[in-house]
């Protein structure tokens, strides 16, 4: 799929690079998995000659250094003498080199340095503090595990706390871009097709690309692709969140499945799970940024709180894939499709509301957008 959207982000990244010609810049780029962070960075800096891309694979530090040295030798056309086994030595070399030669350095999956060697973060802090005044480096670090990136840069006990000079959060595509993409692949698309693409992918770049590249451009085709045997989407929710949640993932999954199924108040969820949930809900909201709490518009007290899953893909995944996983395990995917078709209109009614809210936000014409409800129910305003 060709590159769509992200013009504001590209402009901002290019402005940051220009600023780095005067003084060192340290930018963190965050966003959920598959949101197109890497593609965005490569696109923004495709014309930058001295641009280095380091991917933090789950290897030993020595193996990573060999990969990084290969990239440096290829891009900078400079021989690196001797064997380098510590990332700190590479980082120090690049900061010192940037004092005479501007460099853009992208480090992808930055949080995985914690697995490789946690002391890398404190080494970077010391090297950065000693060299940043004279350096002309555009350092961009990118990460997908939100909770870890948050700890690394926003926990005041961590060595890199406060070192960033800027932050960019890559969000899903807005409605206008989703519409542009679908019309490119299916000029005769219907409103139902557009709503299905928004519902199943949430505008997440890689999910949209998978649908389009597979020729799934109608509502029916998208539903079939979403729940097909061995579909990427079936396993994605679990793969995406297990690393975030760790050993407690089953309890978090149960909470998210209940919220996705319409149990949106703490009381409703606790009455089903029979446990006290304030700690879990707080973490889901603040540490993982997966749910948000809502109160009725204009209400000033914290009453009538409802919780929602913010990510459309996870919302549909927990509503159908996780909830009916037993059907998938025995190959009853056609039965699952019947379940989805039966409740599709009701389910997507809320998604349609979210779509129009996203459109209003994108227009930048409104100062406040929210719903109103009381104990009797929600009013359509």
What spans do the regions from the language model cover?
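N-terminal pre-P-loop "Q-motif" helix
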Residues: 2-15
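Hydrophobic positions on the alpha1 helix immediately C-terminal to the Walker A/P-loop
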Residues: 40, 44
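Mid-core helix/loop region of P-loop NTP-binding domains shared across ATPases and GTPases
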Residues: 78-107, 112-115, 123, 127, ...
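A cross-kingdom feature that marks ATP-driven nucleic-acid transaction machinery
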Residues: 2, 297, 303-381
């Amino acid at each position: 799929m060709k590159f769509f959207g992200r013009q504001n982000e590209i402009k901002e990244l290019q402005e940051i690079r220009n600023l780095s010609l005067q003084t060192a810049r340290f930018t963190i780029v965050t966003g959920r998995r598959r949101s197109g962070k890497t593609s965005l960075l490569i696109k923004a800096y495709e014309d930058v000659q001295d641009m280095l891309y380091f991917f933090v694979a789950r290897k030993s530090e020595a193996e990573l250094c060999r990969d990084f040295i290969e990239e440096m030798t290829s891009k900078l056309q400079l021989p690196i003498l001797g064997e380098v086994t510590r990332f700190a030595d590479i980082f120090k070399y690049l900061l010192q080199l940037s004092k005479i030669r501007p460099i853009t350095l992208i480090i992808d999956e930055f949080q995985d340095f914690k697995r490789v060697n946690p002391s890398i973060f404190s080494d970077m802090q010391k090297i950065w503090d000693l060299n940043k005044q004279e350096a002309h480096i555009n350092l961009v670090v990118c990460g997908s595990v939100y909770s870890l990136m948050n700890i690394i840069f926003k926990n005041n006990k961590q060595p890199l706390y406060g070192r960033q000079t800027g932050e960019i959060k890559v969000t899903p595509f807005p409605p206008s871009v989703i519409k542009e993409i679908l019309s490119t692949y299916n000029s005769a698309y219907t409103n139902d097709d557009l709503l299905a693409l928004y519902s199943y992918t949430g505008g997440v770049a890689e999910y949209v690309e998978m649908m389009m590249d597979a020729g799934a451009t109608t509502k029916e085709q998208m539903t079939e692709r979403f729940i097909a045997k061995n579909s990427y989407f079936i396993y994605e929710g679990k793969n995406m969140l297990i690393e975030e949640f760790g050993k407690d993932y089953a309890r978090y999954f149960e909470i998210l499945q209940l919220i996705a199924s319409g149990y949106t108040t703490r009381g409703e969820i606790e009455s089903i799970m029979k446990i006290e949930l304030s700690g879990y809900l707080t973490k889901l909201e603040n540490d993982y940024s997966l749910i948000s709490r809502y109160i009725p518009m204009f209400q000033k007290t914290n009453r009538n709180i409802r919780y929602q899953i913010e990510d459309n893909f996870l919302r549909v995944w927990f509503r159908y894939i996780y909830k009916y996983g037993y059907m998938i395990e025995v190959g009853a995917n056609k039965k699952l499709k019947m379940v989805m078709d039966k409740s599709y209109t009701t389910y997507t009614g809320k998604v349609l509301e979210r779509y129009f809210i996203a459109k209003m936000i994108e227009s930048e014409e409104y100062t406040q957008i929210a719903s109103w409800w009381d104990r009797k129910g929600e009013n359509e305003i």
